């Protein structure tokens, strides 16, 4: 009579099953993560007006699962930044329209500190599940820099405040008279990073070549020959208002100069 070692066979089968499960678990976890809420596509067109303002349209396609996105999305836009130490640079910001899948959608704007927040969506109802596109159009000022050799914009396309991954970003610049830029560069990654995960898709357009993690974005710099855009008159009162600390610190020096005269 032959006695079979079924216990050993069962043990080996169990070990093999556990090994296969361990190998499959990371893939399952990654697939689950990729299926979460995220920005699928972020397409931006910026038109430079002759008065140096920008009219920007952002088409943001998102995957909605009613986890973090319930009523809509929230775009945070920087309206003030510190440059060269204590100099405060101010960006004008005016929303022109907000749409969801091509139709007007409610929106509200709140400004706090150095940022303006735009809430897009109906606060009284849930946003539709699935893949949907929000379109935000706004006018902004202060982004064109008038340099000795050329003029340029230095523009944070997406901002660095999104809590979702961004799969793909594209950016197109439109200059007055159909002019083309002479110099283009871009930076990807966290605020201040110098990543270069992008490629040019035309003389005035580019796109990212890799996904952006939450908190990451893309900043572009486009330069063109002088004379295409009119430089606005410098407003001293605006500078003094935005840089109150510098203005006040200069008063004693001004008083001293008057005394010496």
Could you tell me what each predicted segment is?
Residues 2-13:
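Positively charged n-region of N-terminal signal peptides that target proteins for export
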Residues 13-14, 38:
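A short catalytic or substrate-binding loop motif that flags glycine-/basic-rich loops and adjacent residues
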Residues 16-24:
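Bacterial N-terminal signal peptides
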Residues 27-260:
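Lumenal/extracellular ectodomains and adaptor appendage modules
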